[in-house]
């Protein structure tokens, strides 16, 4: 009976650690992505989107060449442990270099934990926001 209890306990601990690791990976990824956007490193940020949206992301990237981001704020994070998905609402302050007028846009980011080439990692499932 003790052996069964300890093996169940060890299994529970391992599953818990795995879940915490997945969430920690998510937090690292979404923060890294937003820091890259904040410092106008859009090319580097383009490594985060899933392959399924990479073409659309690159097109949006071209439209953002004249944009300078000055700040961002994380407004809300919704993390679904079972689905391994997350939504992050980010407020971004920016200006277009041609106008120098400060504007704000909301970026509703969708993230998913995916398996790619034998590796599991968090991928951005939404495009860079449109900077009007």
Language model regions located:
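Exposed beta-sheet edge and beta->alpha loop/turn motif
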Residues: 81-132
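Sec-exported extracytoplasmic/periplasmic mature domains
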Residues: 34-38, 42, 47-54, 93-94, ...
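Sec-dependent N-terminal signal peptides
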Residues: 4-14
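Short, aromatic-enriched amphipathic alpha-helices that serve as compact interaction elements
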Residues: 22-38
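Short solvent-exposed beta->alpha transition segments
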Residues: 27-29, 42-87
């Amino acid at each position: 009976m003790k052996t069964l209890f300890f093996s169940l306990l060890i299994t529970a601990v391992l599953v818990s650690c795995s879940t915490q690791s997945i969430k920690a990976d998510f937090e690292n990824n979404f923060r890294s992505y937003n820091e890259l956007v904040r410092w106008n490193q859009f090319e580097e940020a383009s490594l985060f989107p899933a392959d399924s949206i990479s073409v659309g992301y690159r097109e949006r990237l071209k439209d953002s060449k004249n944009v300078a981001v000055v700040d961002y704020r994380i407004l809300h994070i919704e993390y679904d442990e079972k689905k391994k998905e997350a939504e992050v609402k980010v407020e971004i302050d920016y200006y277009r270099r041609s106008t120098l007028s400060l504007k704000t846009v909301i970026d509703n980011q969708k993230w998913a934990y995916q398996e790619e080439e034998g590796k599991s990692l968090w991928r951005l499932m939404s495009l860079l926001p449109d900077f009007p």
